[in-house]
Structures are given as structure tokens and as C-alpha cells.
Amino acid sequence: MHHFTSTYEDYYSHGMREYPLGMRVLYSVVLAILYAFSKLMWRWDFEDADKLFDPNNERGTVIICNHTSMAEVIAIVTHIWAKGHRVRPIFKSEFNKTKIVQWAFSCVGGIPVARGTADLKSLRYAQHALQRGEDVLIFPEGTRIRTDDQPVVIHGGFAIIASMGKTTISPMAVCGFRDLTPKGSKFTKPLKCWMKAGEMLSFDDAPNGLKRKEKSEWVEGEAVKRMYSLRDELQAKHPGRK
């Protein structure tokens, strides 16, 4: 890959360690700054963080998490980077309408997905990333959940990606990040936040006798259940925080 000739598609389809040297250096510098900033500003803790990864698996894992704020994306991605992993966040293709955002998201490893469609090309990008050992970060809720009464629609498909990549799903949850930017405010508060990882899930955990589609649905449902269980556990431990 080259700085001036690489397309967005090149960034989606190539491994992050194949990016141009200058881009890799810039990526590391930016993430180091964001890691330090987020740790100082939000003082986040990551409980059971080692459960995200399987040291015996050379492939990446599909990480799923509840979504309340863009701040948690920074915390999650920089934490994974600090652990020596590379992560590819899945994001809505609507963000690509703004060229600077499209450029920025592609440079940090993001993979766009057109929701509500059979976006096979993006599924393949994610599959190949997992096979290279890169992790894939997905927020199944599809958008930030800002209030308790906001309707939530789980966007499926992450189990299919895990199946295509022949790998595991790592559920995790966040708490406190929703409180950082109150409704109507443009500035974040310096509040402590929390994250927690749960037990990995694989297709081998599904009950025997299920057909392929049924197995995928079971894995997806179980992963989401674990994700929300972790969220509820964090919220119970930190009353009043979301």
C-alpha cells in the first residue's frame, strides 16, 4: 500500500499492519494520546479484560458491546491497541457521506456496513480481518442508546461474521459513558467509567442438533444476553450511572 495511491477499499481489504508506514506511525501516536486522555478524563477501569482474548487462538475475535457514547469507542479501541491487538470497528456506511470522516474511519481500520442489506463485501472484509488475527468490534444496538426508554433494535449479523471467520464472540459491556455528555451539552464531564468483559462464546457452545441457521440464531441470542447481563451487573455495582 502507498500513501497517495491507496483507496478506501485498500484500507478495508488490507491488514492494518500493511498500511503505509507513515499512517501506522500516525495511528499509534493518535491512539497513545487518546489512551492517555481517556484514562485521565474518564478514569475507566476494565474488569476481566483478559477474557476478551484467547492466547491460543491465532484468529481475531468478534467483540460485541452495548453503545451509549462515542467516548466508549475511544476507550475500547485504545485499550485493545495497548494490549498489542489491532481492532476493526464496524460502522454505519452513512458516515461515509462526509469525506473527511470516511478517510479517518478507513485509516483507523473501520469497516463500513450498509444496514438492512446483504452487504457481502463488508462481511468478507471482516472475515479476512479475523483470519489475519485482527479483532472486529461491533455494537449490535446500531446506535447510541441515550435514554432508558429509547427503543432498541438489535442488528444481527455478528454471529455470521464469527462463523465466516471460524472464531469466537467476546461479549463486553460499558457503564457510565452515557453520563459524560448530558443531553444538550457539547462537552464531556470528567467522570469515572467502567467496562467489563464476559466469557467467550463459540459455535461449539450451541446445543446439539441445531441446523446452521438455528445455531447462528442461538449464538447471537446468547451473546446479546451475556452482553446485557454484564451491563446490568455494572449498573447494579454503580447505582445511578449509565
Predicted ranges, named:
Residues 2-50, 99-108:
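A transmembrane-helix-recognition feature enriched in membrane-embedded lipid enzymes
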Residues 42, 116-119, 151:
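A conditional alpha-helix N-cap/helix-loop micro-motif detector
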Residues 46, 89, 110-112, 169-171, ...:
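Conserved beta-strand scaffold positions in the cores of enzyme catalytic domains, especially
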Residues 48, 66, 91-92, 109, ...:
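A secondary-structure boundary/capping signal
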Residues 50-56, 128:
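Short amphipathic alpha-helix with an adjacent loop that forms part of the alpha/beta core around
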Residues 2-22, 121-242:
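Non-catalytic C-terminal accessory region of glycerolipid acyltransferases
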Residues 55-117:
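Catalytic core of membrane glycerolipid acyltransferases/transacylases, capturing the structured
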